[in-house]
A protein has these predicted regions:
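A short, internal acetyl-CoA/4′-phosphopantetheine-binding micro-motif in the GNAT/acyltransferase core
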Residues: 86-93
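A short beta-loop-alpha structural element at the N-terminal edge
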Residues: 5-17
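Conserved active-site alpha-helix within GNAT-family acetyltransferase domains
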Residues: 99, 111, 123-143
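Conserved GNAT-fold acetyl-CoA-binding loop/helix
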Residues: 18-44
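Conserved acyl-CoA
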Residues: 100-116
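Conserved beta-strand in the GNAT
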Residues: 56, 62-70
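Glycine-rich acyl-CoA binding loop
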Residues: 57, 94-102
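A short helix-loop-beta-strand connector motif used in the catalytic cores of GNAT acetyltransferases and
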Residues: 43-56
Length: 163
């Protein structure tokens, strides 16, 4: 197997990353979930003030996985990071690529004074075992936290109700 290299994503990686976002959504049984295109990824990640951080894993200069994360803030501990996605193509799973990608995110978080890294995993996803190997805590079972979301339509309604 060729050497696996983890590096910061570049603008030209956005088409591959967008394809992987769809592959991840398909795996998560949410194929209609992703609405953005690679141009949006380019704009939001590489124009002006980047809205996210992205690393890619490469083998023979071909992108084989990625992480997408961003900074958040916790009123309990301060600066934090959120891991939106971690994905490795099927041919490279169980070859420590995910570990290398996750370690790169952890390193970025620590180097930037983040106190925690949050993420969500679907209840049925066997990747939970991967995260537990590295001592991630399941906050739903440990602290009874549940994740909620306002989708765009409901967010607009809520905002208009405030006027």
């Amino acid at each position: 197997m060729s050497e696996i290299i983890i590096r910061k994503a570049r603008r030209e990686d956005c088409e591959a990353i967008r394809m992987f976002i769809q592959e991840l959504a398909d795996y998560e049984k949410m194929p209609d979930g992703p609405k953005i295109d690679y141009k949006t990824l380019e704009r939001d990640g590489f124009d002006g003030q980047p809205l996210y951080l992205c690393n890619v894993a490469t083998s023979d200069e071909k992108v084989i996985g990625y992480t997408l994360s961003y900074y958040t803030y916790s009123t309990w501990c301060g600066k934090s990071m959120y891991l939106e996605d971690i994905y490795v193509t099927p041919d490279f799973r169980r070859k420590h690529v995910g570990k290398k990608l996750l370690k790169a995110v952890a390193k970025e978080a620590i180097e930037n004074d983040c106190h925690k890294l949050d993420f969500v995993v679907l209840k049925w996803n066997p990747a939970q075992e991967f995260y537990k190997m590295y001592r991630a805590s399941d906050l739903t079972s440990k602290e009874q936290w549940h994740c909620y979301r306002f989708v765009e339509e409901d967010l607009k309604k809520l905002a208009s109700d405030c006027e």
